[in-house]
């Protein structure tokens, strides 16, 4: 068995946010060589996410996003089949897809983090749904974490670094 490759992704700035902690963390965190990185533009673009999976060929995909209102790390457990910007009409991500898809990667939580079953309907949720739908008939695992906008970068790096390390050490994710 070989150790799994991981794709860690985050996002660049959006709307009035000049920075995005998720993209900053993906760029700055020290990671093993079998972890690929992507920082995506904040846009509803299915092909952008699928192309990255095809390019990197990971067994595990960990997404990071920024939460402007949260004070704790949120471990997202499901993506809903809705997309849209705040104040605009929502529409389905996948015309014939299920109402929601569960994340297949178990992410441990502690006092720094809480479980969440509502990732909203913006691009983080969109990426989660598209990736989970793409991976559901494969052995790939995917998970998503929202980081508070004003969270301490050292603590965020420690949390994500520990998650990557635990994921790599867990035989449940080896292919």
Residue ranges of each PLM-predicted region?
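Short glycine/serine/threonine-rich phosphate/pyrophosphate-binding segments
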Residues: 124
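Active-site-adjacent betaalpha module
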Residues: 127-128
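N-terminal catalytic or cofactor-binding beta/alpha core of small enzyme domains
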Residues: 1-121, 131-142, 148, 154-175
